[in-house]
Amino acid sequence: MSSVLVRFAPSPTGRLHLGNARVAVLNWLFAHAHGGAMVLRLDDTDIARGTAEFAQAIRDDLLWLGLTWTREESQLARAARHAEAVDQLKAAGRLYACYETPEELEYRRRRQRAQGLPPIYDRAGLALSAAERAALEAEGRKPHWRFRLDHEETSWLDLARGPCHAHGGHLSDPVLVREDGSLLYTLPSVVDDIDFAISHVIRGEDHVVNTAVQIQICRALGAEPPHYAHLPLVLTAEGGGLSKRDNALSLGDLRAQGIEPAAINALLAALGTAEAPDPLKSLDELAQGFRLDAFGRAAPRLDPADLVRLSARIYHALSPSEARARGIAVSDALWLALRANLTTLSDLDELLPVVEGEITPLIAEEDRAMIDEAARLLPETPWDATTWATWTAAVKTATGRKGKGLFMPLRRALTGVDHGPELAALLPLIGRDKALARLRGEKA
């Protein structure tokens, strides 16, 4: 494959959610699977809603995921170049002025539907004479400009969907320039893809309908189009669409909840394929063997609970040295005792006091005699990983307690909770003095 250059083109009108983060991840993986690179293109022409803060948040979120780009571009800063493309298309006779109001266009569409016809623009603007255009402008009307599609078959090999085609005669000539002179998304996107030498455009299948139009615009500007791949859109677990308004699935909120970026990358890379997500793989490892044709045609559903589960797998596999590198200031033995019980790192706030702080023991009245006997039988130090089994065997013999009736009261007395890390590993870390005090019902 020739040199691969992809682009991720978010609009800085909100935080990244998992849907557009997936586009970024898949573009990066595809590029790096083929020795290529990614361009970050901010589609920042929506001045009313776009902010510099959102743009920076997008950069921060991408870097948090580990995604890199070789260059960053702003569409707004390229307005002069886009205007040149408008002039080029006008000069070639591919842009023509139209003067209908939105109400007039809607009326025509209703009539077409009532007649059983597709609501396709009838090219009335193309038939206007210079005198008719002048008369309309004298009324105060300003033109919007449509791209004249060739009424022919446009075909492309979609790298995710296979062979695709659309006939220009079945499509409305798209508006590229509004009445106020501002450009719709379509033309700047094509111009930027040409100028940046983008080789592959990987995006959601909601853009499939635009592809034939963009290919024709690209060729009208004297360039060959990039390769395209359109993937099914991700749905929520309930079957709804993802949105910037769904804050629970924004990268910023997921980060605040303690979700690991590697968990997000793994899930987004596997979503829609037959592969199980592996959060222990790096981005480079995920890129190895990455294939667009591995994705199915059905819209995958994304359950945030999967991210929690995958994040937990990362913590469970984290070595003491890796934990220290993350700034987790606990001993090796304590980390090994606690990690299997972590869902997010914030769980440490509840677990650490069991060893390093004070807890209030929970001792039910019906367990008091058994706990007193356990305190009497508590072994002398030194303690090791076998102390728990030796001690509980002695308590079992002395009290007749076994199973849950033996272990649950001891856990409540020693930790103040009903569940947690294995006490065989935890008991030596708690220490004899603190354990004895808790068995006596003292806060320690």
Curated annotation (Swiss-Prot):
Pfam families associated with the record: Anticodon_2, tRNA-synt_1c
Record's subunit section: Monomer.
GO biological process terms held by the UniProt record: glutamyl-tRNA aminoacylation
HAMAP family given in the database record: Glu_tRNA_synth_type1
Protein role: Catalyzes the attachment of glutamate to tRNA(Glu) in a two-step reaction: glutamate is first activated by ATP to form Glu-AMP and then transferred to the acceptor end of tRNA(Glu).
Main subcellular location: cytoplasm
Gene: gltX1
Keywords in alphabetical order: Aminoacyl-tRNA synthetase, ATP-binding, Cytoplasm, Ligase, Nucleotide-binding, Protein biosynthesis
Name this polypeptide is given: Glutamate--tRNA ligase 1
Catalytic activity, EC: 6.1.1.17
Family: Belongs to the class-I aminoacyl-tRNA synthetase family. Glutamate--tRNA ligase type 1 subfamily.
Organism: Rhodospirillum rubrum (strain ATCC 11170 / ATH 1.1.1 / DSM 467 / LMG 4362 / NCIMB 8255 / S1)
PROSITE patterns associated with the record: AA_TRNA_LIGASE_I
